[in-house]
Amino acid sequence: MADNKTENTLSSDATEVRAQKLKLLREQIGDVYPAHFHRSLTNAELATRYEGLDPDVETQDIVTVAGRVYSSRNSGMFMDIHDASGKIQIFSHKDVTGEEARALLPMIDIGDIIGVTGIVRRTKRGELTINAQKIEMLTKSLLPMPEKWHGLSDIELRYRKRHLDILTNEDSKLRFQQRSKIVSGIRRFMENDGFMEVETPMLQSIYGGATAEPFKTHHNTLKLDMYLRIAPELFLKRTLVSGLTDKVFEINRNFRNEGVSTRHNPEFTMMECYWAYADYEDMMDLVERLFETLALSIHGTTEFDFGDKRLSFKGPFKRVPMPDAVKEVTGIDFLAIKTDEEARAAAKAAGFAVEKDWTWGECLAFIFEEKVEATLIQPSHVTHFPKDISPFAKEVPGEPRLVERFETYCNAWELGNAFSELNDPEEQRRRMVEQLEQAHARGEKEKQLDEEFLDAIDQGMPPAGGLGIGVDRLIMLLTNAPSIRDVILFPARRSKAD
């Protein structure tokens, strides 16, 4: 085994030093990357077990732990090692540590993963410590940790090398632990509410369920062009038709070949559900119960900070029809406007640039997005959307231009979208044909009518409420993350060459 003079014989380059140490270790101990190591407990379990141990007390208990070296002091006499659950201090001294283990100390660098067996004690200063009797090299790290282990300052590097970001940034580590807790919480909530989870195709021969640009691929064996799904909606509705369950949900990825921003990633996570014999008001109640449950699980309260804002997920949320919201902010009364031409004229008179072929509903939705969204800071349900932009929703009784649809907003972000689902097969076909014609007019020639879905609707779908929630944006709010890339473990990015 190497002695304390080893460092003097090694290169001055940090990476080369580690490579030379690895070579020496291979010569002296053989396997530097063993297949298995048995630890008796995690660092967090150790801390819990000895929480009541008084300062300056040494036990007779021998434990085995493992983790990555994050700091080393006094030539390795004191080391802090971290596992996923926390850290523990390691003490090595000739009075307690075997000669072979002490000889290994000069070969250990920050970032190496080691296993330690020793006696548990608490120092005079109150630090829980293991007096190392045996130290084993489990993984030799060939690269130094970044910036003296205080985290990555380069934002793009954090996304490109997420493993280093989490290794060196406790906030990032906590955020992804919370993400896991939130996704598990959504699944548990839905199951406890009687919903059955299913998995629908990610590769689809006909894309639908939303208006978005898809990713296209080709199946060689089937000789078939296919698309990564933009939404699972049509398959989930077919599941509802099947009678498998009256309450169905899915948590999975959607893909949209569109722009990247602080709120948009081409690959994102959605929770989508359908509830037979319910309507959009039932879905509002479900959203409020779910959001409140998640806030309590992460923060212990329904109120929490996002940036400089104090948000509350305590229901009931504000509910406002879209025409009323637009009238309140802009003064334009869309319910008093009767034609598409009048709607375009009113929008232009108010200073909005609208397209010459836009409908009444498209003008209303555009002005809402331009002027109203930014005012919706606390959780709010915006209801009564235009039918023009909502082909799968039931009409509002007495107002055929509007449908029973809502979107949930918070911090001016859309978090959820829900309908009283259209189940009239003739009306569904008429709207989908109209939507297809509009898509073809925009140049989307590959867009097709999903006859298999329409066939299922002909079979008879029960009245139902449907809901989609953007899981990534919800996690952003609950974890105080300014960008969607902060909550996606490996977000979309340009190649390193770019």
From Swiss-Prot:
Sequence positions that bind Mg(2+) 1: E407, E414
GO molecular function, one term: lysine-tRNA ligase activity
Binding residue positions for Mg(2+) 2: E414
Any one of the GO BP annotations: lysyl-tRNA aminoacylation
UniProt cofactor note: Binds 3 Mg(2+) ions per subunit.
Localization per Swiss-Prot or TrEMBL: Cytoplasm
Domain of life: Bacteria
Keywords, sorted A to Z: Aminoacyl-tRNA synthetase, ATP-binding, Cytoplasm, Ligase, Magnesium, Metal-binding, Nucleotide-binding, Protein biosynthesis
Keyword Aminoacyl-tRNA synthetase appears in the UniProt entry: yes
PANTHER family on file: LYSINE--TRNA LIGASE, CHLOROPLASTIC_MITOCHONDRIAL (PTHR42918:SF15), LYSYL-TRNA SYNTHETASE (PTHR42918)
Name under which the protein is recorded: Lysine--tRNA ligase
Protein species of origin: Rhizobium etli (strain ATCC 51251 / DSM 11541 / JCM 21823 / NBRC 15573 / CFN 42)
